[in-house]
Amino acid sequence: MGDWSALGKLLDKVQAYSTAGGKVWLSVLFIFRILLLGTAVESAWGDEQSAFRCNTQQPGCENVCYDKSFPISHVRFWVLQIIFVSVPTLLYLAHVFYVMRKEEKLNKKEEELKVAQTDGVNVEMHLKQIEIKKFKYGIEEHGKVKMRGGLLRTYIISILFKSVFEVAFLLIQWYIYGFSLSAVYTCKRDPCPHQVDCFLSRPTEKTIFIIFMLVVSLVSLALNIIELFYVFFKGVKDRVKGRSDPYHATTGPLSPSKDCGSPKYAYFNGCSSPTAPLSPMSPPGYKLVTGDRNNSSCRNYNKQASEQNWANYSAEQNRMGQAGSTISNSHAQPFDFPDDNQNAKKVAAGHELQPLAIVDQRPSSRASSRASSRPRPDDLEI
């Protein structure tokens, strides 16, 4: 019989892009159909016409009786069956090769865009379009092709056609031959002079092979149906999981990136705004040294330093004779920093600069401290 190596190599490449059911189906096709058909079955049917004898000497009678009994040889019929059930799988393989070719083109274009990006060209939109196309074709990292979108539909269609071909060939075989062979066939056709009996060689052995090939066809049909349900429910499960998983939805290849460079949308994107007020207002002439607001000791020290600075500032204003109502004692109330929960949220959103101790740039003098307790000429007398 012909060489099956070319078909075997093509079908072997499909295993890398098939489900578990598809791999089992290919194993059944290779072992129990192609291998068995090329060895035992072909030898059993090798003498089917030469050993077909009829009880007549009329020339041509045996040929017409054989043609009536076996319109097509069982071996050739099974070869056609194998070819037809393999064609949908080969079409799916062609689609896989098409996707891989698309992947090569997209990767080449992506490399060119990245080179242009290093030169300062804005190609972010083009890179995102390439990622969307890869996701559409089912291309993942490291060249792995995932069954998704058009590739998944092609795989389902191939399973449907394989199942249809299996059923069709089983019905044709039952209509032409049945599923058993008789030892004697009665024939009455021209040029036979009368009704003649024809005898078939090894009918029991051939019947066993017919039943075996019938069982293999039924097993292949059952595998196709199981795989069809598996692919369908797996697709539904992945779709439901993709909708219900918020992490997957926000971290997928199509999720928009955060724009931390725009101060207008910084807070909505989970970024810290560079123009946001990071510390409470200080009295005029004082500077704030930034530090970590989460530190509890630094937070207590800042509170005490702020109270002391406000008190000193009020005393100096009163000493200089300014109106006491300009700064009330309410300004010297302690400043409460936000609670720890709000600090934790801000720290998680982005690194912020927080206030540390309030430092007075003016040097302190003993004369000023002593002069504050001595009476002055312009003091009010009661």
UniProtKB/Swiss-Prot annotation:
The keyword Zinc does not apply. Residues 317-382 are annotated as: Disordered. GO terms for biological process: adult heart development; ATP transport; atrial ventricular junction remodeling; blood vessel morphogenesis; bone development; bone remodeling; cardiac conduction; cell communication by chemical coupling. Detected in ventricle and atrium (at protein level). The modification Phosphotyrosine is found at Y247. The chain crosses the membrane at residues 24-44, 77-97, 156-176, 208-228. Residues 264-382 are annotated as: Interaction with UBQLN4. Residues 244-382 are annotated as: Interaction with NOV. Keywords: Acetylation, Cell junction, Cell membrane, Disulfide bond, Endoplasmic reticulum, Gap junction, Isopeptide bond, Membrane, Phosphoprotein, S-nitrosylation, Transmembrane, Transmembrane helix, Ubl conjugation. There is a cross-link at K144, K237 (Glycyl lysine isopeptide (Lys-Gly) (interchain with G-Cter in SUMO)). InterPro entries: Alpha_helix_dom_sf (IPR035091), Connexin (IPR000500), Connexin43 (IPR002261), Connexin43_C (IPR013124), Connexin_C (IPR034634), Connexin_CCC (IPR019570), Connexin_CS (IPR017990), Connexin_N (IPR013092). The modification Phosphothreonine is found at T275, T326. Disulfide bonds join C54-C192, C187-C198. It holds the Pfam family Connexin43. Residues 362-374 have a biased composition (Low complexity). It is a multi-pass membrane protein. Residues 317-332 have a biased composition (Polar residues). It is found in: Cell membrane; Cell junction, Gap junction; Endoplasmic reticulum. Residues 2-23, 98-155, 229-382 are cytoplasmic. Induction: In bladder smooth muscle cells, exhibits night/day variations with low levels during the sleep phase, at circadian time (CT) 4-8 (at protein level). Expression starts to increase around CT12 and forms a plateau during the active phase (CT16-24) (at protein level). The modification S-nitrosocysteine is found at C271. The modification Phosphoserine is found at S5, S255, S257, S262, S306, S314, S325, S328, S330, S365, S368, S369, S373. One of its GO terms (cellular component) is lateral plasma membrane. Belongs to the connexin family. Alpha-type (group II) subfamily. Gap junction protein that acts as a regulator of bladder capacity. A gap junction consists of a cluster of closely packed pairs of transmembrane channels, the connexons, through which materials of low MW diffuse from one cell to a neighboring cell. Negative regulator of bladder functional capacity: acts by enhancing intercellular electrical and chemical transmission, thus sensitizing bladder muscles to cholinergic neural stimuli and causing them to contract. May play a role in cell growth inhibition through the regulation of NOV expression and localization. This is Gap junction alpha-1 protein. It comes from Rattus norvegicus (Rat).
